[in-house]
């Protein structure tokens, strides 16, 4: 098995052309054709069909793509694992998280990480937890911090942070003086909601009995925008306690406990079970284990 042949095969499958793949890989078209012929001889199957000026994968080619990607990824992992043994963490930490986690959780963690490993560059993939998990599973992202629960037997999952959800109101809202608030009282207020995500799913479930009297004034994709509009008095929102510290500290807003139900948001560190983490990512996991993980180690979801 020649890894170079597999690289050529994957480029042709992406570009739909032997000549364009050759140009990208700085190889002549005859050399590209020879590599594919050798692969086809090895597997005993035709891998491409010509369709006009382009080429398309055969059924055998489609089957090979999955394994070709896996083999090349394993090659890179093995090279990284061996070279990392002789050096302190370098390279890039590829991490995924949603917007709120990037803004309100990661800065302190990254500051501690950077003090220990200044040579590591940090690359953040920002998206919803579901998308972050997809990127971890396909190997694009090394580790992710996502909202739990996560159900995936292919992932190692550690609980690292639990935050209380509270009602955020403007300082001028009469509820700002309340010691607590019920779901029914919240339902009487104009609502500013996230468009999607864990908190929105939780809200929709909790307030289903109050749907008739709910007034949703705004739906926003950004936690930062939600906080600004709540502070301006345009509505209320259920939000993680740690996300609203600045607004509470400045006096622009208040956080009111919800009395008839205990609401929390739990964050977890996730990464693939079957993959050797790059040294930079492994160092990040170790740092979080020291700072955040409970004494019993991995979250129960990882023990399946």
Regions found by a protein language model. Give the residues of each.
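Hydrophobic hinge/microswitch elements
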Residues: 128-133, 137-141, 146-147, 198-256
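Short helix-boundary/capping micro-motifs
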Residues: 12-28
């Amino acid at each position: 098995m020649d890894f170079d042949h597999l690289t050529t095969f994957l480029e042709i499958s992406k570009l739909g052309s032997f000549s364009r793949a050759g140009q990208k890989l700085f190889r002549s078209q005859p050399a590209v054709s020879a590599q594919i012929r050798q692969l086809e001889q090895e597997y005993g199957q035709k891998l491409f069909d010509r369709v006009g000026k382009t080429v398309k994968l055969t059924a055998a080619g489609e089957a090979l793509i999955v394994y070709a990607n896996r083999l090349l990824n394993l090659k890179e992992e093995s090279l990284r694992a061996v070279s990392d043994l002789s050096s302190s963490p370098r390279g890039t930490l590829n991490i995924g998280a949603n917007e709120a986690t990037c803004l309100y959780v990661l800065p302190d963690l990254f500051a501690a990480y950077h003090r220990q490993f200044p040579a590591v560059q940090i690359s953040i993939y920002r998206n919803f937890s579901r998308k972050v998990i997809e990127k971890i599973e396909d190997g694009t992202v090394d580790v992710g911090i996502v909202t739990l629960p996560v159900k995936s037997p292919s992932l190692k999952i550690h609980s690292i942070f639990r935050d209380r959800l509270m009602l955020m109101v403007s300082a001028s809202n009469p509820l700002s003086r309340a010691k607590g608030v019920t779901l029914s009282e919240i339902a009487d207020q104009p609502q500013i909601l996230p468009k999607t995500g864990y908190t929105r799913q939780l809200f929709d479930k909790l307030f289903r009995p109050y749907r008739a009297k709910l007034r949703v004034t705004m739906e926003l994709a950004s936690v930062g925008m939600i906080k600004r509009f709540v502070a301006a008095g345009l509505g209320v929102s259920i939000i993680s306690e740690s996300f609203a510290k600045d607004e509470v500290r400045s006096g622009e807003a208040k956080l009111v406990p919800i009395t008839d139900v205990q609401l929390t948001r739990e964050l977890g560190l996730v990464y693939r079970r079957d993959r050797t983490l790059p040294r930079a990512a492994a160092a990040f996991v170790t740092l979080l284990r020291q700072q955040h993980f409970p004494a019993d180690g991995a979250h129960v979801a990882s023990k399946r």
